[in-house]
Regions:
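Register position in tetratricopeptide repeats
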Residues: 427, 461-462, 495, 525-532
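A detector for small-residue-rich transmembrane helices and their helix-helix packing motifs
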Residues: 2-248
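Conserved polar/disulfide-associated segments of primarily extracytoplasmic proteins
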Residues: 267-370, 375-379, 404-405
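Helix-start (N-cap) detector for alpha-helical repeat units in TPR-like alpha-solenoids
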Residues: 415-416, 449-450, 483-484, 517-518
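Surface-exposed amphipathic alpha-helical segments
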Residues: 263-266, 367-410
Length: 536
Protein backbone atom coordinates (compact mmCIF):
# COMPACT_ATOMS: atom_id res chain seq x y z
CA UNK A 1 0.00 0.00 0.00
CA UNK A 2 1.30 3.44 -0.88
CA UNK A 3 2.07 5.72 0.84
CA UNK A 4 3.46 3.43 3.57
CA UNK A 5 1.56 3.44 6.87
CA UNK A 6 4.65 2.98 9.05
CA UNK A 7 8.10 4.46 8.54
CA UNK A 8 9.73 3.00 11.63
CA UNK A 9 11.25 -0.42 12.06
CA UNK A 10 12.03 -2.05 15.34
CA UNK A 11 12.80 -5.57 16.47
CA UNK A 12 9.57 -5.60 18.42
CA UNK A 13 7.22 -5.42 15.41
CA UNK A 14 4.29 -7.72 15.51
CA UNK A 15 4.52 -11.30 14.36
CA UNK A 16 7.04 -14.03 14.96
CA UNK A 17 10.40 -13.86 13.14
CA UNK A 18 10.43 -16.02 10.06
CA UNK A 19 12.65 -16.44 7.00
CA UNK A 20 11.30 -14.95 3.81
CA UNK A 21 12.47 -15.13 0.23
CA UNK A 22 13.51 -11.99 -1.54
CA UNK A 23 10.30 -11.96 -3.53
CA UNK A 24 8.24 -12.02 -0.33
CA UNK A 25 10.34 -9.42 1.41
CA UNK A 26 9.45 -6.61 -0.97
CA UNK A 27 5.79 -6.49 -0.11
CA UNK A 28 6.34 -5.98 3.61
CA UNK A 29 8.77 -3.09 3.52
CA UNK A 30 7.87 0.11 5.28
CA UNK A 31 10.86 2.32 4.53
CA UNK A 32 10.95 5.22 2.12
CA UNK A 33 8.29 6.05 -0.41
CA UNK A 34 7.24 4.30 -3.57
CA UNK A 35 10.18 2.68 -5.44
CA UNK A 36 9.82 4.98 -8.42
CA UNK A 37 13.28 4.31 -9.82
CA UNK A 38 12.69 0.57 -9.90
CA UNK A 39 9.23 1.00 -11.41
CA UNK A 40 10.57 3.36 -14.08
CA UNK A 41 13.41 0.97 -14.90
CA UNK A 42 11.03 -1.98 -15.20
CA UNK A 43 8.73 0.06 -17.44
CA UNK A 44 11.63 1.08 -19.67
CA UNK A 45 12.77 -2.55 -19.98
CA UNK A 46 9.30 -3.66 -21.05
CA UNK A 47 8.88 -0.70 -23.41
CA UNK A 48 12.20 -1.22 -25.18
CA UNK A 49 11.55 -4.92 -25.67
CA UNK A 50 8.11 -4.13 -27.03
CA UNK A 51 9.53 -1.56 -29.45
CA UNK A 52 12.18 -4.01 -30.64
CA UNK A 53 9.58 -6.71 -31.23
CA UNK A 54 7.35 -4.25 -33.06
CA UNK A 55 10.22 -3.56 -35.48
CA UNK A 56 10.51 -7.25 -36.38
CA UNK A 57 11.83 -10.55 -35.02
CA UNK A 58 14.33 -10.05 -32.20
CA UNK A 59 17.30 -11.87 -33.69
CA UNK A 60 21.01 -11.33 -33.29
CA UNK A 61 21.19 -8.60 -35.93
CA UNK A 62 18.31 -6.76 -34.26
CA UNK A 63 20.02 -6.91 -30.88
CA UNK A 64 23.26 -5.59 -32.39
CA UNK A 65 21.39 -2.78 -34.10
CA UNK A 66 19.68 -1.80 -30.84
CA UNK A 67 22.91 -1.79 -28.81
CA UNK A 68 23.76 -5.29 -27.56
CA UNK A 69 27.15 -5.80 -25.97
CA UNK A 70 29.50 -7.30 -28.54
CA UNK A 71 33.18 -7.37 -27.65
CA UNK A 72 34.52 -6.61 -31.15
CA UNK A 73 32.21 -3.61 -31.54
CA UNK A 74 33.10 -2.31 -28.08
CA UNK A 75 36.85 -2.79 -28.43
CA UNK A 76 37.55 -2.62 -32.18
CA UNK A 77 34.93 -0.05 -33.20
CA UNK A 78 35.08 1.97 -29.97
CA UNK A 79 31.36 1.63 -29.20
CA UNK A 80 31.79 1.64 -25.43
CA UNK A 81 28.21 2.86 -24.98
CA UNK A 82 27.08 -0.72 -25.64
CA UNK A 83 28.20 -1.56 -22.10
CA UNK A 84 25.21 0.52 -20.95
CA UNK A 85 22.58 -0.12 -23.63
CA UNK A 86 22.94 -3.91 -23.46
CA UNK A 87 21.17 -3.95 -20.08
CA UNK A 88 17.95 -2.65 -21.62
CA UNK A 89 17.64 -5.42 -24.23
CA UNK A 90 16.35 -8.98 -23.85
CA UNK A 91 16.32 -12.03 -26.10
CA UNK A 92 12.69 -12.96 -25.56
CA UNK A 93 9.72 -12.47 -23.26
CA UNK A 94 10.64 -15.16 -20.66
CA UNK A 95 14.09 -13.60 -20.34
CA UNK A 96 12.50 -10.18 -19.81
CA UNK A 97 9.77 -11.42 -17.47
CA UNK A 98 12.14 -13.20 -15.10
CA UNK A 99 14.43 -10.19 -14.84
CA UNK A 100 11.59 -7.73 -14.32
CA UNK A 101 9.89 -9.85 -11.64
CA UNK A 102 13.05 -10.29 -9.58
CA UNK A 103 13.99 -6.64 -10.12
CA UNK A 104 10.60 -5.50 -8.82
CA UNK A 105 11.06 -7.67 -5.75
CA UNK A 106 14.71 -7.14 -4.86
CA UNK A 107 15.12 -3.71 -6.44
CA UNK A 108 12.02 -2.26 -4.79
CA UNK A 109 13.15 -3.50 -1.40
CA UNK A 110 16.63 -2.09 -1.82
CA UNK A 111 15.40 1.27 -3.10
CA UNK A 112 13.08 1.71 -0.11
CA UNK A 113 15.73 0.63 2.36
CA UNK A 114 18.56 2.82 1.02
CA UNK A 115 18.70 6.40 -0.14
CA UNK A 116 17.66 6.71 -3.74
CA UNK A 117 20.94 8.21 -4.94
CA UNK A 118 22.82 5.28 -3.38
CA UNK A 119 20.47 2.87 -5.11
CA UNK A 120 20.90 4.66 -8.45
CA UNK A 121 24.68 4.57 -8.03
CA UNK A 122 24.49 0.85 -7.27
CA UNK A 123 22.58 0.23 -10.51
CA UNK A 124 25.14 2.18 -12.54
CA UNK A 125 28.11 0.52 -10.85
CA UNK A 126 26.52 -2.92 -11.12
CA UNK A 127 25.77 -2.39 -14.80
CA UNK A 128 29.39 -1.54 -15.50
CA UNK A 129 30.65 -4.42 -13.36
CA UNK A 130 28.33 -6.82 -15.18
CA UNK A 131 29.66 -5.76 -18.56
CA UNK A 132 33.24 -5.78 -17.27
CA UNK A 133 32.81 -9.41 -16.24
CA UNK A 134 31.11 -10.28 -19.51
CA UNK A 135 33.67 -8.51 -21.70
CA UNK A 136 36.59 -9.88 -19.72
CA UNK A 137 35.31 -13.41 -20.18
CA UNK A 138 34.02 -13.33 -23.74
CA UNK A 139 33.62 -11.03 -26.69
CA UNK A 140 30.29 -12.61 -27.61
CA UNK A 141 26.92 -10.91 -27.83
CA UNK A 142 25.21 -10.38 -24.48
CA UNK A 143 22.01 -8.60 -23.40
CA UNK A 144 19.76 -8.38 -20.36
CA UNK A 145 19.30 -6.79 -16.96
CA UNK A 146 20.27 -9.96 -15.10
CA UNK A 147 23.44 -8.38 -13.78
CA UNK A 148 21.43 -5.56 -12.19
CA UNK A 149 19.13 -8.13 -10.61
CA UNK A 150 22.03 -10.11 -9.19
CA UNK A 151 23.53 -6.89 -7.84
CA UNK A 152 20.31 -5.99 -6.02
CA UNK A 153 20.12 -9.49 -4.56
CA UNK A 154 23.76 -9.37 -3.49
CA UNK A 155 23.36 -5.97 -1.83
CA UNK A 156 20.26 -7.17 0.04
CA UNK A 157 22.13 -10.24 1.28
CA UNK A 158 24.93 -8.19 2.80
CA UNK A 159 22.65 -5.46 4.16
CA UNK A 160 20.41 -8.06 5.75
CA UNK A 161 23.38 -9.65 7.44
CA UNK A 162 24.90 -6.37 8.63
CA UNK A 163 21.67 -4.91 10.03
CA UNK A 164 19.86 -8.06 11.10
CA UNK A 165 19.62 -6.76 14.66
CA UNK A 166 17.46 -3.82 13.56
CA UNK A 167 15.54 -5.52 10.77
CA UNK A 168 12.72 -7.91 11.67
CA UNK A 169 13.16 -11.40 10.36
CA UNK A 170 9.82 -11.29 8.56
CA UNK A 171 10.99 -8.24 6.57
CA UNK A 172 14.49 -9.33 5.57
CA UNK A 173 16.75 -12.25 6.33
CA UNK A 174 19.74 -12.71 4.11
CA UNK A 175 20.07 -16.44 4.63
CA UNK A 176 16.66 -16.97 3.03
CA UNK A 177 17.88 -15.73 -0.33
CA UNK A 178 21.14 -17.69 -0.45
CA UNK A 179 19.57 -20.91 -1.83
CA UNK A 180 17.76 -18.90 -4.51
CA UNK A 181 20.97 -17.19 -5.61
CA UNK A 182 22.88 -20.46 -5.67
CA UNK A 183 20.15 -22.13 -7.73
CA UNK A 184 20.19 -19.26 -10.25
CA UNK A 185 23.98 -19.44 -10.55
CA UNK A 186 23.91 -23.22 -10.91
CA UNK A 187 21.27 -22.97 -13.64
CA UNK A 188 23.44 -20.46 -15.45
CA UNK A 189 26.64 -22.50 -15.33
CA UNK A 190 24.84 -25.63 -16.55
CA UNK A 191 22.95 -23.91 -19.37
CA UNK A 192 24.03 -22.89 -22.85
CA UNK A 193 24.01 -19.26 -23.95
CA UNK A 194 23.98 -17.75 -20.45
CA UNK A 195 26.40 -14.93 -19.64
CA UNK A 196 27.60 -16.38 -16.35
CA UNK A 197 30.59 -14.05 -16.09
CA UNK A 198 28.24 -11.07 -16.38
CA UNK A 199 25.95 -12.47 -13.69
CA UNK A 200 28.90 -13.06 -11.41
CA UNK A 201 30.20 -9.54 -12.03
CA UNK A 202 26.84 -8.07 -11.06
CA UNK A 203 26.55 -10.25 -7.97
CA UNK A 204 30.06 -9.36 -6.77
CA UNK A 205 29.34 -5.67 -7.32
CA UNK A 206 26.18 -5.97 -5.24
CA UNK A 207 27.91 -7.88 -2.45
CA UNK A 208 30.69 -5.31 -2.33
CA UNK A 209 28.28 -2.38 -2.45
CA UNK A 210 26.31 -3.93 0.39
CA UNK A 211 29.36 -3.48 2.61
CA UNK A 212 29.25 0.29 2.12
CA UNK A 213 25.53 0.98 1.70
CA UNK A 214 23.62 2.19 4.75
CA UNK A 215 19.88 2.24 5.52
CA UNK A 216 17.98 5.49 5.50
CA UNK A 217 18.04 5.83 9.30
CA UNK A 218 21.85 6.17 9.28
CA UNK A 219 23.43 9.66 8.98
CA UNK A 220 23.57 10.98 5.43
CA UNK A 221 27.14 11.10 4.05
CA UNK A 222 26.16 13.04 0.93
CA UNK A 223 27.51 12.12 -2.47
CA UNK A 224 30.75 10.51 -1.33
CA UNK A 225 29.44 6.95 -1.27
CA UNK A 226 27.49 6.94 -4.58
CA UNK A 227 30.22 8.78 -6.47
CA UNK A 228 32.84 6.43 -5.06
CA UNK A 229 30.91 3.36 -6.22
CA UNK A 230 30.50 4.69 -9.75
CA UNK A 231 34.12 5.82 -10.02
CA UNK A 232 35.37 2.43 -8.84
CA UNK A 233 33.18 0.67 -11.41
CA UNK A 234 34.36 3.00 -14.18
CA UNK A 235 38.00 2.33 -13.31
CA UNK A 236 37.50 -1.45 -13.30
CA UNK A 237 35.54 -1.40 -16.55
CA UNK A 238 38.07 0.89 -18.18
CA UNK A 239 40.84 -1.50 -17.18
CA UNK A 240 38.99 -4.44 -18.74
CA UNK A 241 38.35 -2.52 -21.97
CA UNK A 242 42.00 -1.46 -22.13
CA UNK A 243 43.17 -5.02 -21.52
CA UNK A 244 40.92 -6.38 -24.27
CA UNK A 245 42.07 -3.62 -26.64
CA UNK A 246 45.64 -4.93 -26.82
CA UNK A 247 46.49 -6.26 -30.28
CA UNK A 248 48.52 -9.37 -30.99
CA UNK A 249 50.90 -10.25 -33.82
CA UNK A 250 49.83 -13.31 -35.81
CA UNK A 251 52.71 -14.93 -37.69
CA UNK A 252 52.54 -17.54 -40.42
CA UNK A 253 55.93 -19.21 -40.51
CA UNK A 254 55.28 -20.92 -43.82
CA UNK A 255 54.34 -17.69 -45.60
CA UNK A 256 56.85 -15.57 -43.71
CA UNK A 257 54.00 -13.15 -43.07
CA UNK A 258 53.09 -11.32 -39.85
CA UNK A 259 49.84 -9.39 -39.39
CA UNK A 260 48.66 -7.42 -36.35
CA UNK A 261 45.16 -8.46 -35.25
CA UNK A 262 42.78 -7.41 -32.49
CA UNK A 263 43.27 -9.73 -29.54
CA UNK A 264 39.92 -11.52 -29.76
CA UNK A 265 39.93 -12.28 -33.48
CA UNK A 266 39.67 -16.01 -34.06
CA UNK A 267 41.73 -18.06 -36.50
CA UNK A 268 40.13 -20.56 -38.85
CA UNK A 269 40.25 -21.93 -42.38
CA UNK A 270 37.54 -20.61 -44.70
CA UNK A 271 35.52 -22.55 -47.26
CA UNK A 272 38.23 -22.13 -49.88
CA UNK A 273 41.00 -23.51 -47.68
CA UNK A 274 42.56 -20.11 -46.98
CA UNK A 275 44.02 -19.08 -43.64
CA UNK A 276 41.32 -16.81 -42.22
CA UNK A 277 40.49 -14.76 -39.13
CA UNK A 278 37.31 -13.04 -37.99
CA UNK A 279 35.99 -10.96 -35.12
CA UNK A 280 33.72 -13.87 -34.20
CA UNK A 281 30.45 -12.08 -34.91
CA UNK A 282 27.95 -13.54 -37.37
CA UNK A 283 25.83 -11.53 -39.76
CA UNK A 284 25.64 -7.78 -39.39
CA UNK A 285 28.81 -7.21 -37.38
CA UNK A 286 31.17 -9.67 -39.05
CA UNK A 287 34.66 -8.58 -40.13
CA UNK A 288 37.21 -10.96 -41.64
CA UNK A 289 40.77 -11.28 -42.89
CA UNK A 290 42.15 -14.07 -45.07
CA UNK A 291 45.55 -14.72 -46.60
CA UNK A 292 46.66 -16.95 -49.42
CA UNK A 293 49.95 -17.45 -51.26
CA UNK A 294 49.47 -17.84 -55.02
CA UNK A 295 52.25 -19.47 -57.03
CA UNK A 296 52.57 -17.23 -60.09
CA UNK A 297 55.57 -19.01 -61.63
CA UNK A 298 57.13 -15.74 -62.78
CA UNK A 299 58.08 -12.55 -60.96
CA UNK A 300 55.50 -9.80 -61.46
CA UNK A 301 53.76 -6.85 -59.84
CA UNK A 302 50.57 -8.65 -58.75
CA UNK A 303 48.39 -6.94 -61.36
CA UNK A 304 47.65 -10.21 -63.18
CA UNK A 305 46.38 -11.83 -60.00
CA UNK A 306 44.42 -8.70 -59.06
CA UNK A 307 42.59 -8.63 -62.38
CA UNK A 308 41.97 -12.36 -62.23
CA UNK A 309 40.40 -11.92 -58.78
CA UNK A 310 38.34 -9.02 -60.10
CA UNK A 311 37.10 -10.92 -63.15
CA UNK A 312 36.56 -14.36 -61.62
CA UNK A 313 35.56 -13.71 -57.99
CA UNK A 314 34.15 -10.17 -57.90
CA UNK A 315 31.82 -10.48 -60.88
CA UNK A 316 29.33 -7.64 -60.62
CA UNK A 317 25.90 -8.91 -59.62
CA UNK A 318 27.16 -12.44 -59.06
CA UNK A 319 27.52 -14.14 -55.66
CA UNK A 320 30.98 -14.64 -54.19
CA UNK A 321 32.20 -16.26 -50.96
CA UNK A 322 31.94 -12.86 -49.24
CA UNK A 323 28.59 -11.85 -50.78
CA UNK A 324 27.02 -10.51 -53.96
CA UNK A 325 29.23 -7.96 -55.70
CA UNK A 326 27.61 -4.55 -56.16
CA UNK A 327 30.59 -2.44 -57.20
CA UNK A 328 34.31 -3.03 -57.73
CA UNK A 329 37.15 -0.62 -58.48
CA UNK A 330 40.12 -1.08 -60.79
CA UNK A 331 43.39 -2.25 -59.21
CA UNK A 332 45.74 0.56 -58.19
CA UNK A 333 49.34 0.60 -57.02
CA UNK A 334 49.93 0.48 -53.25
CA UNK A 335 52.62 -0.25 -50.67
CA UNK A 336 52.29 -3.03 -48.09
CA UNK A 337 55.00 -3.94 -45.62
CA UNK A 338 57.58 -1.98 -47.61
CA UNK A 339 56.70 -3.81 -50.83
CA UNK A 340 54.92 -2.75 -54.00
CA UNK A 341 51.41 -4.16 -54.28
CA UNK A 342 48.10 -3.90 -56.10
CA UNK A 343 44.93 -2.90 -54.26
CA UNK A 344 41.27 -3.03 -55.19
CA UNK A 345 38.04 -2.25 -53.35
CA UNK A 346 34.56 -3.68 -53.70
CA UNK A 347 31.13 -3.16 -52.20
CA UNK A 348 29.17 -6.33 -51.49
CA UNK A 349 25.80 -7.38 -50.20
CA UNK A 350 26.93 -9.85 -47.56
CA UNK A 351 24.94 -12.18 -45.30
CA UNK A 352 24.64 -9.42 -42.70
CA UNK A 353 24.03 -6.52 -45.08
CA UNK A 354 26.28 -4.10 -46.99
CA UNK A 355 29.93 -5.08 -46.70
CA UNK A 356 33.20 -3.48 -47.77
CA UNK A 357 36.02 -5.55 -49.25
CA UNK A 358 39.65 -4.65 -49.82
CA UNK A 359 42.04 -7.06 -51.54
CA UNK A 360 45.82 -6.60 -51.65
CA UNK A 361 48.13 -8.49 -53.98
CA UNK A 362 51.75 -8.39 -52.82
CA UNK A 363 54.35 -10.00 -55.11
CA UNK A 364 57.26 -11.86 -53.57
CA UNK A 365 59.37 -13.41 -56.28
CA UNK A 366 57.39 -16.16 -57.97
CA UNK A 367 54.65 -15.87 -55.33
CA UNK A 368 51.86 -13.37 -54.85
CA UNK A 369 50.31 -12.97 -51.41
CA UNK A 370 46.61 -12.22 -51.57
CA UNK A 371 45.28 -10.48 -48.46
CA UNK A 372 41.51 -9.98 -48.33
CA UNK A 373 39.76 -7.85 -45.70
CA UNK A 374 35.99 -7.47 -45.25
CA UNK A 375 34.12 -5.31 -42.77
CA UNK A 376 30.47 -4.27 -42.26
CA UNK A 377 29.33 -0.98 -43.77
CA UNK A 378 27.12 -0.51 -40.70
CA UNK A 379 30.25 0.04 -38.59
CA UNK A 380 32.54 2.41 -40.53
CA UNK A 381 34.98 2.56 -37.60
CA UNK A 382 36.17 -0.86 -38.73
CA UNK A 383 37.94 0.85 -41.64
CA UNK A 384 40.46 2.18 -39.11
CA UNK A 385 40.96 -1.36 -37.81
CA UNK A 386 41.65 -2.62 -41.33
CA UNK A 387 44.00 0.29 -42.07
CA UNK A 388 45.99 -0.53 -38.95
CA UNK A 389 46.18 -4.20 -39.89
CA UNK A 390 47.51 -3.27 -43.34
CA UNK A 391 49.98 -0.76 -41.90
CA UNK A 392 51.44 -3.40 -39.58
CA UNK A 393 51.86 -6.19 -42.15
CA UNK A 394 55.42 -7.48 -42.02
CA UNK A 395 57.25 -9.91 -44.30
CA UNK A 396 59.61 -12.23 -42.45
CA UNK A 397 61.92 -14.99 -43.56
CA UNK A 398 59.78 -18.05 -44.37
CA UNK A 399 60.59 -21.35 -42.72
CA UNK A 400 61.58 -22.93 -46.06
CA UNK A 401 64.35 -20.34 -46.47
CA UNK A 402 65.61 -20.79 -42.90
CA UNK A 403 65.71 -24.54 -43.41
CA UNK A 404 67.60 -24.15 -46.71
CA UNK A 405 70.16 -21.88 -45.04
CA UNK A 406 70.59 -24.37 -42.19
CA UNK A 407 71.17 -27.30 -44.57
CA UNK A 408 73.76 -25.31 -46.53
CA UNK A 409 75.61 -24.53 -43.29
CA UNK A 410 75.40 -28.09 -41.98
CA UNK A 411 76.90 -29.60 -45.15
CA UNK A 412 79.48 -27.06 -46.35
CA UNK A 413 80.92 -27.70 -49.80
CA UNK A 414 77.98 -29.87 -50.91
CA UNK A 415 76.45 -28.64 -54.20
CA UNK A 416 72.93 -29.93 -53.46
CA UNK A 417 72.16 -27.76 -50.39
CA UNK A 418 73.73 -24.73 -52.08
CA UNK A 419 71.60 -25.31 -55.18
CA UNK A 420 68.47 -25.63 -53.03
CA UNK A 421 69.32 -22.45 -51.11
CA UNK A 422 69.89 -20.48 -54.30
CA UNK A 423 66.63 -21.74 -55.80
CA UNK A 424 64.62 -20.77 -52.73
CA UNK A 425 66.22 -17.32 -52.62
CA UNK A 426 65.45 -16.69 -56.27
CA UNK A 427 61.86 -17.90 -56.06
CA UNK A 428 61.28 -15.64 -53.04
CA UNK A 429 62.39 -12.58 -55.01
CA UNK A 430 66.00 -12.40 -53.80
CA UNK A 431 67.94 -13.11 -57.02
CA UNK A 432 70.97 -11.03 -56.01
CA UNK A 433 71.45 -13.17 -52.90
CA UNK A 434 70.84 -16.33 -54.94
CA UNK A 435 73.79 -15.72 -57.27
CA UNK A 436 76.51 -16.59 -54.73
CA UNK A 437 75.26 -20.05 -53.60
CA UNK A 438 74.28 -20.98 -57.17
CA UNK A 439 77.68 -19.96 -58.55
CA UNK A 440 79.39 -22.05 -55.88
CA UNK A 441 77.13 -25.01 -56.66
CA UNK A 442 78.00 -24.71 -60.38
CA UNK A 443 81.71 -24.69 -59.49
CA UNK A 444 81.29 -27.84 -57.38
CA UNK A 445 79.07 -29.67 -59.91
CA UNK A 446 79.65 -28.08 -63.35
CA UNK A 447 77.71 -30.73 -65.28
CA UNK A 448 74.46 -30.14 -63.38
CA UNK A 449 72.27 -28.40 -65.96
CA UNK A 450 69.46 -27.45 -63.58
CA UNK A 451 71.87 -25.46 -61.41
CA UNK A 452 73.18 -23.57 -64.44
CA UNK A 453 69.59 -22.77 -65.47
CA UNK A 454 68.84 -21.46 -61.98
CA UNK A 455 72.00 -19.34 -62.07
CA UNK A 456 71.03 -17.88 -65.46
CA UNK A 457 67.60 -16.95 -64.13
CA UNK A 458 69.10 -15.41 -60.99
CA UNK A 459 71.44 -13.23 -63.09
CA UNK A 460 68.62 -12.15 -65.42
CA UNK A 461 66.20 -11.36 -62.58
CA UNK A 462 68.96 -9.38 -60.86
CA UNK A 463 69.26 -7.28 -64.07
CA UNK A 464 72.71 -8.71 -64.86
CA UNK A 465 71.63 -9.52 -68.40
CA UNK A 466 74.92 -10.42 -70.11
CA UNK A 467 76.04 -12.63 -67.25
CA UNK A 468 72.64 -14.29 -67.37
CA UNK A 469 72.87 -14.86 -71.12
CA UNK A 470 76.37 -16.33 -70.68
CA UNK A 471 75.06 -18.70 -67.99
CA UNK A 472 72.16 -19.67 -70.28
CA UNK A 473 74.55 -20.42 -73.13
CA UNK A 474 76.67 -22.64 -70.87
CA UNK A 475 73.55 -24.46 -69.71
CA UNK A 476 72.75 -25.12 -73.38
CA UNK A 477 76.24 -26.60 -73.87
CA UNK A 478 75.78 -29.04 -70.99
CA UNK A 479 72.15 -29.79 -71.87
CA UNK A 480 71.50 -29.14 -75.56
CA UNK A 481 68.11 -30.85 -75.43
CA UNK A 482 67.13 -29.75 -71.94
CA UNK A 483 63.96 -27.65 -72.08
CA UNK A 484 65.08 -25.67 -69.03
CA UNK A 485 68.31 -24.68 -70.80
CA UNK A 486 66.39 -23.77 -73.95
CA UNK A 487 63.94 -21.72 -71.91
CA UNK A 488 66.86 -19.90 -70.27
CA UNK A 489 67.90 -18.82 -73.76
CA UNK A 490 64.38 -17.50 -74.35
CA UNK A 491 64.61 -15.43 -71.18
CA UNK A 492 67.98 -14.11 -72.28
CA UNK A 493 66.61 -12.81 -75.57
CA UNK A 494 63.57 -11.29 -73.87
CA UNK A 495 65.86 -9.49 -71.42
CA UNK A 496 67.77 -8.10 -74.40
CA UNK A 497 64.48 -6.96 -75.95
CA UNK A 498 64.73 -9.30 -78.95
CA UNK A 499 61.23 -10.83 -79.08
CA UNK A 500 61.70 -12.44 -82.51
CA UNK A 501 64.85 -14.24 -81.43
CA UNK A 502 63.10 -15.27 -78.20
CA UNK A 503 60.29 -16.81 -80.25
CA UNK A 504 62.83 -18.80 -82.31
CA UNK A 505 64.37 -20.17 -79.12
CA UNK A 506 60.93 -21.01 -77.79
CA UNK A 507 60.04 -22.91 -80.96
CA UNK A 508 63.21 -24.98 -80.44
CA UNK A 509 62.12 -25.78 -76.91
CA UNK A 510 58.65 -26.75 -78.15
CA UNK A 511 60.18 -29.23 -80.60
CA UNK A 512 61.90 -30.95 -77.69
CA UNK A 513 58.72 -31.12 -75.60
CA UNK A 514 55.63 -30.39 -77.73
CA UNK A 515 53.27 -31.45 -74.93
CA UNK A 516 54.48 -28.83 -72.43
CA UNK A 517 51.41 -26.63 -71.87
CA UNK A 518 53.46 -23.87 -70.28
CA UNK A 519 55.76 -23.58 -73.30
CA UNK A 520 52.76 -23.67 -75.62
CA UNK A 521 51.12 -20.80 -73.72
CA UNK A 522 54.38 -18.83 -73.78
CA UNK A 523 54.69 -19.30 -77.55
CA UNK A 524 51.13 -18.09 -78.06
CA UNK A 525 51.79 -15.04 -75.91
CA UNK A 526 54.96 -14.15 -77.83
CA UNK A 527 53.24 -14.52 -81.19
CA UNK A 528 50.45 -12.24 -79.94
CA UNK A 529 53.03 -9.63 -78.94
CA UNK A 530 54.72 -9.80 -82.34
CA UNK A 531 51.42 -9.55 -84.22
CA UNK A 532 50.41 -6.51 -82.18
CA UNK A 533 53.75 -4.77 -82.76
CA UNK A 534 53.87 -2.25 -85.67
CA UNK A 535 55.62 -3.58 -88.79
CA UNK A 536 58.81 -1.88 -89.88
Amino acid sequence: MYPPQKTRLSPEEEGQPRLLSIGQSAGGMRLGGAPWLTLILATVLVGIHGAARAAGPVGLDTLLRWGAKAGPLVVDAGQVWRLVTAHFLHRDFPHLALNVLVLLAAGSGLERLCRRRDYAALLVAAGLATMAGSLGSSGGVSVGASGLVYACVGALLVLGRRHRAKLPARWMSSEAAVPTVLVFLWMGWTSVGVDNAGHLGGLLAGLLAGVFLEPRWHPDTGWLRPVGMVVAAVVVTGGVVAERSVWRMERDDGFGLSVALPRDWRGDVDGQGRRAFSNGLPGRGRATFSAEAIEAGEPGDGSVQARQFQQEVLVQGAPSPEGRTLKVTEPVAARVGGRSAQRLHAELEGPGGPTHLMALFVPRGEWVYRLVFTWPAAYPAYREVVDRMVAEVRFDEPSVLREARARALLVPGAPGPLRALGGVLRRLGLPKEAVAPLSESVRLAPAHVETRVELARAFLEASRVEEGCHAAAEARVYGPWDTGALEAGVRCELSRGNVERALERLVEARRVDPQDARLRAAELALRTVLEAAPHR
